[in-house]
Amino acid sequence: MKKIITILMLILSTLSFAAKKLYVGTNAEFKPYEYLENNKMVGFDIELMELLGKELGYEIKWQDMSFDGLLPALQMKKIDTVIAGMSATPEREKAVSFSIPYVFFEGGHDVIVNDKSSFKKKEDLKGKTIGVQLGSIQEQFAKDNGSIPKLYNNFTEALLDLQNQKIDAVIIAEVSGKEYLKTMKGIKKIDTIKDKLPNASIAFRKTDAKLAKEFSDTILKLKNSPEYAKLVKKYFPEHYDNFIASLKKNK
């Protein structure tokens, strides 16, 4: 009888462990948040989620998909949560819930053009075609600028079209734009758009309030840790001092 009870306990323990798998959706085309390197997903979000998962006892199972498909996949329960450098905009909050922000520094959005163009500032692009990622906040920035947004599955496609002068500009998050400007020829930055949107957060189904709170509480716990500061310094070195100042301000 004792053997049977022991076996049952082992089975239950195994099932309990299996239930701790957390399927996380991301879009690995947004360096330095998440991107592919030697066919492996790396980046700030990837390491942070693994750190959060370790703290909470979850085994993270990654699902890479298109950015505009992330929230629908979450709502359809194909994944459990989303981390993808995503801001908790009012429009998105109608569909899903968010953790507290996990990035604590101000950012902007680069306006990038072909280096042969004569555009000098964002106002020069009124009525012009601007490439943006489908489902991103940059689409609204283009509209607010009086420009015509052209939607792409990812920013790489948009920037390739910009190189070939098929569009007039691309608007992309500053931290990601910086990476493309290092490696892609024939493009240049002419302006920056600042916004008052919240920093990046993790998305959850509205019915998963307990899970969202778990992650929010753990973000609060980790944000002052050496591990967190190390990640910021690794992936956002230019924002490190700003990050430390922001932490002191928000204590």
State each model region's role.
Residues A19-M86:
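Extracytoplasmic small-molecule ligand-binding "clamshell" domains
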Residues G25-F30, Q63-D68, K77-T89, D115, ...:
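Beta->alpha turn/N-cap motifs
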Residues A28, F104-V113, K178-L220, E238-K251:
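Periplasmic-binding protein-like
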Residues I46-E55, K116-F119, E123-D124, T129, ...:
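Extended ligand-binding regions for polar small-molecule ligands
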Residues Y58, S87-A88, I100-I148:
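A conserved helix-loop-strand patch within extracytoplasmic ligand-binding domains
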Residues Y58-E59, Q75-A84, K128, Q163-S176, ...:
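Alpha-to-beta junction loops
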Residues K61-L74, L134-G135, K150-N164, K196-P198:
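Short helix-initiation/N-cap motifs at beta->coil->alpha
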Residues P72, M86-A95, F141, D168-K196:
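A ligand-binding cleft/hinge motif common to bilobed small-molecule-binding domains
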